[in-house]
């Protein structure tokens, strides 16, 4: 078979990287399927060329000899509105998947494609981010080495009104907020508790992948019974997620911006979280299917 071709959205390419890359990063081109339906928000395509044909505005059949093998027009096809060899981001000239014929039955496009959309990637990525943060928190709570024993307790969060510039220090007496980089105030509240994540090698949330991309989108809440300085952590002083009681800690990802949310103001919870999750201090949270008014992702213990 012919060599495969690949295109990736500028927002998702590796070199140079677009920052940030998170739930609000969208694909920048579209694909038209053989029926004429548009697949929007595409982040990458893998294209398998069909047999050589004469492109719409070409004078001869595609040349796939060694001399023409690096010219995409010798492999990829076009219609009057889409050119697979010369696509443009953020325009209607994206990609078109074959088979496509003209009114006389002549094949215009015989390229076939595998499409990767925003939803294909971002749902997995968001789940990985949430799980990583939860694992950091539970590993922290379980830490017991030498004179440091966290006794099953979790660190203070960073309050919503904290500056959006480093260092991101935990805020005293804050059981809901963003993820801190430094746990200074947790250690001041309970000197036997860790003051940093560095003693947990598996925890990477202080690294650039999280700090540059996800820090503003991820939140957590801890049950009052599991806050720093509490004694003998136990329920019933715990959180609730839907019908599930006795929850110690909840991690939430504010997914793609919904209508009415304005994330230039990063201090308002409702600009990131919806429903019960936007009123976190009552200890009641909800995990539900994605809709036009709700798209929070929750993981918890």
Range-by-range predicted roles:
Residues 2-301:
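N-terminal pilin/flagellin-like segments and related low-complexity appendage regions
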């Amino acid at each position: 078979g012919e060599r495969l071709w690949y295109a990736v959205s500028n927002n998702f390419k590796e070199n140079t990287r677009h920052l940030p890359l998170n739930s609000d990063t969208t694909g920048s081109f579209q694909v038209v399927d053989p029926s004429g339906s548009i697949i929007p928000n595409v982040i990458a395509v893998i294209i398998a060329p069909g047999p050589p044909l004469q492109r719409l505005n070409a004078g001869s059949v595609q040349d796939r000899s060694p001399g023409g093998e690096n010219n995409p027009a010798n492999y990829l096809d076009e219609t009057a509105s889409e050119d697979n060899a010369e696509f443009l981001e953020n325009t209607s000239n994206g990609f078109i998947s074959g088979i496509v014929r003209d009114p006389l039955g002549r094949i215009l496009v015989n390229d076939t494609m595998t499409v990767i959309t925003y939803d294909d990637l971002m749902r997995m990525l968001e789940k990985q981010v949430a799980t990583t943060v939860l694992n950091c928190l539970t590993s922290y709570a379980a830490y017991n080495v030498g004179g440091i024993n966290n006794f099953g307790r979790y660190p203070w969060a960073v309050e919503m009104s904290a500056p959006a510039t480093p260092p991101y220090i935990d805020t005293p007496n804050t059981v809901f907020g963003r993820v801190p980089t430094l746990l200074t105030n947790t250690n001041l509240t309970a000197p036997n508790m860790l003051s940093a994540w560095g003693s947990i090698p598996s925890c990477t949330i202080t690294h650039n992948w999280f700090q540059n991309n996800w820090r503003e989108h991820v939140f957590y809440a801890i049950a009052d019974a599991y806050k720093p300085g509490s004694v003998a952590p136990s329920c019933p002083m715990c959180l609730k997620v839907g019908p599930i009681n006795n929850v110690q800690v909840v991690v939430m990802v504010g997914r793609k911006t919904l209508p009415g949310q304005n994330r230039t103001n990063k201090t308002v919870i409702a600009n990131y979280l919806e429903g019960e999750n936007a009123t976190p201090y009552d200890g009641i949270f909800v995990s539900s299917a994605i809709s036009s008014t709700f798209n929070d992702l929750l993981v918890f213990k």
